[in-house]
């Protein structure tokens, strides 16, 4: 999800484990999270969900921190956005492993950490 876009869920997006994981498995976990989020919203009478800017910034910082512990930052690869002249170099995929990614996502459902839900 992205700040300023209420109820906009998207799969296989930037800073997910996309290129570093099995595609169908990734989409299944993300899809299950979306279904669970919507079901929880319905049960609690909520109609909108939006990621906070702070959550977006924190996620980017986590992805950067994890990436900085690898050799990725020193490579000229599309993983770092180096294939587009002038584009800022940053990690485009979650490099923390799929189990951690799933745990981070599931944790966000507990109390809607990082979201405004109304």
State each model region's role.
Residues 1-10:
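FAD-site-proximal beta/loop scaffold in flavoenzymes
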Residues 9-118:
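C-terminal, flexible cofactor-proximal segment of oxidoreductases
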